[in-house]
Amino acid sequence: PVLTMKYFISQFMADIYLLKEAAVSNDRKNLSKLKKKAHQSGKRALNNSKKVALNCVKTLRLMGEYYWLIGKQKKALNWWDKSIKTGEAMGARPDLSRTYFEVGKHLLAPGSKYKDLNGITAEEYLDKAKTMFIEMDLQWDLDELDKLMAGR
């Protein structure tokens, strides 16, 4: 299960990337097919994460990213809420901090219908992420956060 977990997570991440690229380039021809493929790989990763808790928080975060990408923001927030609660319960700090970052980033996005999740604003999630990135010396993540803030 551990080796298949890495494969399923990688496949899901690749499918999300391709879906993002198709959405950005307005590739309507492939969008439907890529949505379906990402959904299937997400379900496989999610089912596998139930057997191997190692990447559970990451998988839940990616499910949120998938649903946000396809325009289902409320579902995305529900997945991110699950990711946060699971990350807090498991003490999975790196993935929890990355979930905070994703939530903050998406709540700040121009097309966001929501301004908070569980009463916590985008800025507060980004502050939480930054604090954790610094504590864990996650320089790449900190650089990504800095890029986001510079672009605001």
Model-found features: residue ranges?
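Helix-coil-helix junctions within alpha-helical repeat/solenoid scaffolds
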Residues: 1-152
